[in-house]
Amino acid sequence: MKWINKNRENQPASLKRHLTTPHHNYDNYKEKDELRDALLKEQGFICCYCMQRIQEANKNKMEIEHFRPQSIYDGTNGKPDLTLDYTNLLASCKGNEGSLKHLQHCDEHKGNDEVEINPMNKDLMGKIRFNAAGRIFVSETNELDKRLNHDLNHTLNLNIQTLVTERKKIWQTLEQRMRKEFGTKNPSKSFINQKIKEWSAQDEGKFKTMCQVAIYYLEKKLKKAV
C-alpha cells in the first residue's frame, strides 16, 4: 500500500452532473468508465491496496472500491450516504475474482467488511513496512497497530503467496543491483536518491507495480548511505 493523494477536484464531470439529478444513486450512474478512468489516473494505474498494475479503466480490469462499504454507508441506519462520494471511491484490482476465498485479495476479499488501514491517510501509510521475505506489515506497538495488521493479513489478504513472491522479487532485484554497484561497501546517497526518484516517478502517468516496496527498501538504505 502507498498513500493516495485524494482530491475531490479529480472527480469526473459526469459524476458532478449525476449528483445534481433527481433520485441519483450509484446504480443509475451510467458513466462509470469515466469514474474508473479518473480513479486510475489519480492512483497512477496501480491498485489502492496491493499496488499491482491495473491496465485499463473498465469493469473487466478493475473494481470501483467503496472504502466505506456501500452496504453500510448508504444513508440508512444513521450512517451517511457515501456511495457516490468521490473521497470514498478508489480503484482496486480484481483480486483473483472467482477464485476460492483464501486465494482472493484486496476489495474482492474485503467484501463488505470495514478496515482501518486507509490508503488515503498519510499518517497510517507511514506505518507500512515491508521485509526481505516480501511481507507487508505494521510494527505493533499498540492496539491500533494490531488492528491494522489484521486488516492487512486477514481482511485484505495482502500476504497471500502470489503478492509476497512479487514483493520479494523486487526486494531481491534491488539488493542484487546494490551488490553489483557497491559490493560490501555502503551505497552512495546520490545513487540511492536517484533510484528513489525513479521509483517515485510516473511513466506516462503510471507508477511501477508495487513501487512503494522499492521506495521503502531504498529509504532504509539511504540511512546507511555515504
Predicted regions and their residues:
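Long, low-complexity, intrinsically disordered segments enriched in glycines and aromatic residues
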Residues: 100-159, 163
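Short, well-structured alpha-helical interface segments that form or flank functional binding sites
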Residues: 34, 42-45, 59-62, 84, ...
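Short Fe-S-cluster ligation motifs
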Residues: 11, 75-94, 122-137
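Histidine-centered nuclease catalytic patch
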Residues: 52-91, 95-104
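Class I S-adenosyl-L-methionine
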Residues: 1-29, 103-120, 161-183, 192, ...
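C-terminal, charged low-complexity interaction regions
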Residues: 141-226
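Short, charged surface segments at domain edges that flank catalytic/cofactor-binding sites
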Residues: 3-49, 73-84
